[in-house]
Amino acid sequence: GHTIVNTDVALVPIALNDAWGKKIAGITLQDIKLTPYHNGVKQKAHKGKVLFTHFGMSGPTVLNMSKEIGEMIQYGDVTIMLDLFPKLDHSALKKELQTLLVEGSNKRLKTVLATLMPLALVTALLTLLKINGDTPNHSVRSEDRTAIITMMKSVPLHVSGLLGSEKAVVSSGGVALSEVNFKTMESRVIP
């Protein structure tokens, strides 16, 4: 008979431990960078689209990296750092934020930040940072601006696991590929 390779989920949404993530369920972010850390060691980054859900996150980029995450989580902790603005380095983002705060000096902090990202995400991040979003922009402290920029460049997400096979788009494993003729899809083992 055929050799069977262990089956596993390959393209599947990622579950998160972060309770605040539920507050941003339904938000889709485009062109962000996701960098996984396995036991504190940086891994290969991925860029693209992410959808936040009530359990964690999904979307093309997340699905594409889920197999790697699944392998990593078997051997330790996995944290994914989100860079919400990968096209801007830290200093360029600082300059952009400073310009927005000056231009809208009488507006509230969360109103100006909502021009850069969805309001629900702004609210969640400011809550994590313990910064009052209703603060007028002219009163935002320098250390708060620095904390906001740092957070926008590295939002930590703590992975609890992958959703099961019932949520997987694709699974891996099954009949060993070396035992199948790809041109005809016939077995090489059983004539």
Task: Describe these PLM feature segments.
Residues 3-8, 12-139:
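An anion/pyrophosphate-binding glycine-rich loop and adjacent beta-alpha core
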